[in-house]
Amino acid sequence: MKQKFDIITSTCVPLPLESVDTDQIIPARFLKATTREEKFFGDNLFRDWRYHPDGSLNNDFVLNNPLYGGEILVAGKNFGSGSSREHAAWAIAGYGFRVVVSSFFADIHKNNELNNFVLPVVVSEGFLQELFDSIYANPQMQVEVNLPEQTITNQATGKSEHFEINAYKKHCLMNGLDDIDFLVESKDKIEAWENVSR
């Protein structure tokens, strides 16, 4: 879903597991759908962790724990590894997450998140661990993600870190533009350049 991104302040969902791959994010059996049906993919985010094989709810999994919720997923190192399926980003966005925080993302998945209006924020290992500690100490603790300033702040500790983002992707997120929207927005500039170049 296209949404302009500025500053998000939210509680967080902690997932302190390393190397969460795209098959765990959205299992392969749900890839038959080739259009972005947000509710379908969101409902099946982390499907094999959220439910037991018999279809009953796994109450031990964090998404089923009423203590935790919000628009920010805080995940362990190497998030989104494995296959390049864009469906994984569709599932994350479809569930309602607008930010994923980790100390490292698989490159293709990171780009897929950006293309689907989810902001991947890379932080240091130390900052990530402090986030987990703060969330577990107080599930209502909030984190502020400021895209214009490119900062993330743990409001429990007051500590902030700067994060990097490609300037083009930042522009698109802040203005709610996908790649096609950007080309349309830039039409006059492109035509002017073509006229000068002839």
Residue ranges of model-derived segments:
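Cytosolic catalytic domains that perform sulfur/thiol-centered chemistry
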Residues: 1-76, 80-198
